[in-house]
Structure formats: structure tokens, C-alpha cells
Swiss-Prot record:
Its EC number is 6.3.2.1. The gene is panC. The reaction proceeds by a bi uni uni bi ping pong mechanism. It holds the Pfam family Pantoate_ligase. It comes from the Bacteria. This is Pantothenate synthetase. GO terms for biological process: pantothenate biosynthetic process.
Length: 284
């Protein structure tokens, strides 16, 4: 596996790969890799000749009171994991390489219809930071395929919309959620869950699945279902951020006649904010 810190090195290596007729798969990450990240890399390997992973803790997508400075930097371990599963290239730029003119002067990419709801409502500017850095990474790597995890469903939907709107020639693939044995979605932020909270930390997943089953059983009182699910989370000792029954494509509140629905939620533990989602198809 080759390790790059500079854009020119990435472009040179991938240019040679393309000249040899190879397809390029890309998995952008912020590092602190776990099995869910590695599954995305393996998925990219199944569909492309060479795979590049980026590790960049993007300060532009963190809010003022968020955990950018606390986000784990584990490059040595991450590189070892990627090398073990056969990743071809690892791109780890410094902030000045990605934002040479500084973040305040950086041109921004915004998906206005989807970025200010759900996670975007409680994390203003977050998705603007995501779409800006992903656009830059797409321009650097120019992948044939990019793989994003379904756990970050809103991010996935926004990236798909951005690629469509800006005519970016990349296929976006979705990687399934990887879960712990009790249903908790794997996340780098799970390390902030306390030992006392951990046995109850799967409550968000349980409440989302409870809503899913209720809809499949015929309930269409979506507002009531959302409120009841939030109460379940509160009863378990956590603070719900949001729980929304949404149209899977637009992320707008689901209508009674929608057939593709995603139930998304976020909750706060003592020191972490966890997100999760479940999707379902409804026959009306």
C-alpha cells in the first residue's frame, strides 16, 4: 500500500493506474477505522481494480462546540488495517493541503434542500463542510466509484443529490450498516459511550425498529409514532435529538402514500451523539 500526503502524488499514481486501464474505487474517511469502514473498502475492492482511502479529519464539518480536537487520530493503526485487507493507496493530507487558502476563504458547496434538516438542524454548517470536502476529494481522486455507509443516511442522500446536481462522473455505492451483536451501529464515537451506558446504548436502534414494525403493521399516525419513540429513548436514560419518519429520497417528512420510507434518529449519551436509521418499503 502506498501512502500519500500530497495531491500531486495521488494524481500521479492514479493517472498511471487509469493509463493501464484500471478502475478506481474511493472510500473517504476521517480515520479511527473499525470494521464498518473496512467493509466499505472491501466493497470497493469487489467493484474496482484499485482502491484508495482518504483519512482527513475535516474541521470544516465540525461545529464550535463539537469534538474535532477530541476525534481520535490513529493513523498507524488505520494504515495497518488497510494494508491487511489489501487497500492500494492511502491519502492523508494535512489541512493546508486541502485548504491552501484557509477555510474562511474556501469556496463552499451547499445542497440547500437537504442540509438543514435532521442532523443539519442541530449541527448547522455540518453538511456544508461535508459536501465541500467531498467535492474536493472527488476532484483530486476522480474515482469511478465511491462508497459511503448507510449509517450516515442523510450524508449519503446529500452526496447523491450533489453528484446528480453537479454532474460529477462518479457512481455512489451504499455500504450496509455494520452492527454490534446487540444492534448498536458501529461508529468511531462509540468509544465515548460509558460502561454504564453501554448496555442501553442500542435503544436508538430498538426504537427505530419499533417504529418500522408499527408502520409495516399499518399505522400511519407518523407524528404520534415519532413522539412515542422519543419517549422510549428518554425512558432508557438518553436525550433524543430527533426521530423522523422520512421519504427515503428527499428526506422530507413521509406522506401516508409514500412507499419508500426511512426512519432516522439521533440521541445523546453523556459524551456522544449517536445516529442510526432503518428503511422499509410499504405496499399501499
Amino acid at each position: 500500500m502506498e501512502l500519500f500526503h500530497h495531491i500531486k502524488s495521488v494524481r500521479d499514481a492514479l493517472g498511471k493506474a487509469r493509463a493501464a486501464g484500471k478502475t478506481v474505487g474511493f472510500v473517504p474517511t476521517m480515520g479511527n477505522l473499525h470494521n464498518a469502514h473496512l467493509a466499505l473498502v472491501q466493497q470497493a475492492k469487489q467493484h474496482c481494480d484499485v482502491v484508495i482511502v482518504s483519512i482527513f479529519v475535516n474541521r470544516l464539518q465540525f461545529g464550535l462546540n463539537e469534538d474535532w480536537d477530541k476525534y481520535p487520530r490513529t493513523l498507524q493503526d488505520d494504515a495497518a488495517k488497510l494494508r491487511e485487507i489489501g487497500c492500494d493507496y492511502l491519502f492523508c493530507p494535512e489541512e493546508g493541503e486541502v485548504y491552501p487558502n484557509g477555510m474562511d476563504a474556501q469556496t463552499r458547496v451547499i445542497v440547500p434542500s437537504m442540509a438543514n434538516v435532521l442532523c443539519g438542524a442541530s449541527r448547522p454548517g455540518h453538511f456544508e463542510g461535508v459536501t465541500t470536502v467531498v467535492t474536493k476529494l472527488f476532484n483530486i481522486v476522480q474515482p469511478d466509484i465511491a462508497v459511503f455507509g448507510i449509517k450516515d443516511y442523510q450524508q449519503l442522500a446529500i452526496i447523491r443529490r450533489m453528484v446528480e446536481d453537479l454532474c460529477i462522473p462518479v457512481e455512489i455505492m451504499a455500504g450496509d450498516i455494520v452492527r454490534e451483536a446487540d444492534g448498536l451501529a458501529m461508529s468511531s464515537r462509540n468509544g465515548f459511550i460509558t460502561a454504564q451506558e453501554r448496555p442501553r446504548a442500542n435503544q436508538l436502534n430498538q426504537s427505530l425498529n419499533w417504529v418500522k414494525q408499527a408502520i409495516l403493521d399499518g399505522r400511519r399516525d407518523f407524528d404520534v409514532l415519532e413522539s412515542e419513540a422519543k419517549k422510549q429513548i428518554e425512558t432508557a436514560g438518553f436525550r433524543p435529538d430527533y426521530l423522523s419518519i422520512s421519504n427515503s429520497k428527499t428526506l422530507e417528512p413521509a406522506a401516508n402514500d409514500d412507499t419508500d420510507i426511512t426512519v432516522l434518529g439521533a440521541m445523546y449519551t453523556e459524551a456522544a451523539r449517536l445516529i442510526d436509521n432503518v428503511s422499509l418499503s410499504v405496499v399501499n
